Amino acid sequence: NLTISFSGTLDAHMNRLEKEDGRKMTNLELSLRTGLSDRYIQDLRKEEKNVSFETVCAICIGLHLHPKFSNDLISKSRNDYPLTEEGYFDQFLIEHHYMETLDLCNDKLREMGYRTWGKEL
């Protein structure tokens, strides 16, 4: 069940998802996929924090969330896609490249001259 909060929803996704090897998704694994610290991810799962749009997108791609779940998480983070060409491209990546790596998405963002998501790995 997904809650109405960002932190509760992120925690629920982390608890239900499995890595490729069938084991539970961990803060450390998501940290390795996004460049965000495992401590920061732990904090995001426990308490409501202001989180940037780019950080939420990095988490969505790192978890390979289906676009419906990504859009829900983005909304709960009190963010939205900017109504710009960059925002439309962000939405395109979330909706069509969610099974890719964050590195690949960031390469596409860089090619377009847009801000990258997460931290550089």
Map each language-model feature to its residues.
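A short, Lys/Arg-rich alpha-helix, primarily the initiator
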Residues: 1-26, 102-121
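Recognition helix of helix-turn-helix/homeodomain-like DNA-binding domains
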Residues: 31-51, 76-78
